[in-house]
């Protein structure tokens, strides 16, 4: 009786890992033991940076809103405080978009909130 092995599943497993390493340079793309480490590390970075991306974009939106608010004679913190007191619920992403794409509308918005 021939020896049983797990060739089909093993080949599929190796192929799946190697596919994730497509485009990697040198042995990181074709030597299985090195590829496993490279793919593991890449997935760790991806997991971490999906969370960091949210923080980075929030900081960017705040910077843009603050810059536009200062052009209108106020600051980000005063603007947000006034928004909270008047119960204006516009998220930072939308406000930053308005500040960049339509400065006149942002000026109108700031005047409505501050006054």
From Swiss-Prot:
Q: Does the keyword RNA-binding apply?
A: yes
Q: Name one GO cellular component term.
A: ribonucleoprotein complex
Give the record's keywords alphabetically. Answer: Ribonucleoprotein, Ribosomal protein, RNA-binding, rRNA-binding
Family under the similarity heading: Belongs to the bacterial ribosomal protein bL20 family.
Q: What is this protein called?
A: Large ribosomal subunit protein bL20
Q: So which domain of life are we looking at? A: Bacteria
Gene3D superfamilies, per the entry: 6.10.160.10, Ribosomal protein L20
Asked if DNA repair is a keyword of the record, the answer is: no
Q: What does this protein do?
A: Binds directly to 23S ribosomal RNA and is necessary for the in vitro assembly process of the 50S ribosomal subunit. It is not involved in the protein synthesizing functions of that subunit.
The record's Gene Ontology biological-process terms are: ribosomal large subunit assembly; translation
Organism of this sequence: Chlorobium phaeovibrioides (strain DSM 265 / 1930) (Prosthecochloris vibrioformis (strain DSM 265))
Mind listing the GO molecular function terms for this protein?
rRNA binding; structural constituent of ribosome
Pfam families (UniProt xref): Ribosomal_L20
């Amino acid at each position: 009786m021939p020896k049983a092995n797990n060739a089909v599943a093993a080949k599929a497993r190796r192929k799946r890992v190697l596919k994730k390493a497509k485009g990697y340079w040198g042995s990181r793309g074709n030597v299985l033991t090195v590829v496993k480490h490279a793919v593991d590390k890449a997935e760790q970075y991806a997991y971490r940076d999906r969370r960091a991306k949210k923080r980075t974009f929030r900081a960017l939106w705040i910077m843009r809103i603050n810059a536009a608010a200062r052009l209108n004679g106020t600051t980000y913190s005063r603007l947000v405080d006034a928004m909270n007191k008047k119960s204006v619920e516009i998220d930072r992403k939308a406000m930053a978009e308005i500040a960049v794409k339509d400065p006149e509308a942002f000026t109108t918005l700031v005047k409505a909130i501050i006054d």
